[in-house]
């Protein structure tokens, strides 16, 4: 519901609200953190329920910072809420613990093609929920963005663009 409201705001007014409250939606917190960080000229306070503010997001924020993101913890280090100043990210090579959450990996992959250099993501440790990462890569491909997963590394080249020509109907 929170994402729907945010998207409706974008559609109606052309800009996101200054405060985005995702409630208890953990997936939305992870994906929107990456999306907002990679959206130039966007300043957002991303928050959620009291319980959401107890759920760690530090590994994702650190990975995004390595790509050049401007993200500040508004309360407690490693946890939402977040102050995000979006910009085009530099990209590059980053390492991420693979046993935390496949959603961190998916969030990074989905914004990787928008970076200046692309992203080479080195997964460290046993991969959590590999089928979800594979699903992310397949959906990205359906929308025109290719990722290559070889061993513990996933690469996404810069300059690829998501397209509307895909087999999905919403």
Region annotations inferred by a language model:
Residues 1-170:
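Structural preference for solvent-exposed beta-strand-turn elements
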